């Protein structure tokens, strides 16, 4: 983390050299010109389109021997395999906590520095991670994303919406393997399982 002095204002990623930052920023603001004919996804670089197209053709994919998930790049497979091995090669020098991704360590480090480069344009609240800002911005949305057709209640999260819908349908998809009792919410199943 120390020594990386060029930071991307869009995602917070840091670089040692200004040239690397400028090259990276093309991904955010570049004119997207290369379109996948299979799925319509658009890319700023032809090389990224070619890599993406391997998903559709199945050519030169790297497959995880543990779970079968496939990747277009070997480095992404190696990063993914840390899920199975439990390897966490990136350690915080401040508190000793370890992470499986460099980007996760970088975001964690902001806890110690107090850095919050992402500001909500609606209310001015600041965040250390862009994803946290995105989640927060959904709370400002005038029109909620998911509306229940039964009662009109609205939700910003799809998972909460589906959970709510089960109150109308009576659906109980979470079943205890010990006794067969079913629950509408996974959390209720977990609480129940502690009784066995």
Swiss-Prot record:
**Which Gene Ontology MF annotations are present?**
DNA-binding transcription factor activity, RNA polymerase II-specific; RNA polymerase II cis-regulatory region sequence-specific DNA binding; zinc ion binding
Q: Which GO terms describe its cellular component?
A: nucleus
UniProt keyword annotations, A-Z: DNA-binding, Metal-binding, Nucleus, Repeat, Transcription, Transcription regulation, Zinc, Zinc-finger
- Protein's cellular compartments: Nucleus
Instruction: Please list the coiled coil stretches.
Output: none
Task: Tell me one GO biological process term.
Answer: regulation of transcription by RNA polymerase II
Positions annotated as zinc finger (C2H2-type): 6-28, 34-56, 62-84, 90-112, 118-140, 146-168, 174-196
Matching entries from InterPro entries are given as: Znf_C2H2_sf, Znf_C2H2_type
Question: One Pfam family of this protein, by short name?
Answer: zf-C2H2
- The name of this protein is Oocyte zinc finger protein XlCOF26
Q: What species was this sequence derived from?
A: Xenopus laevis
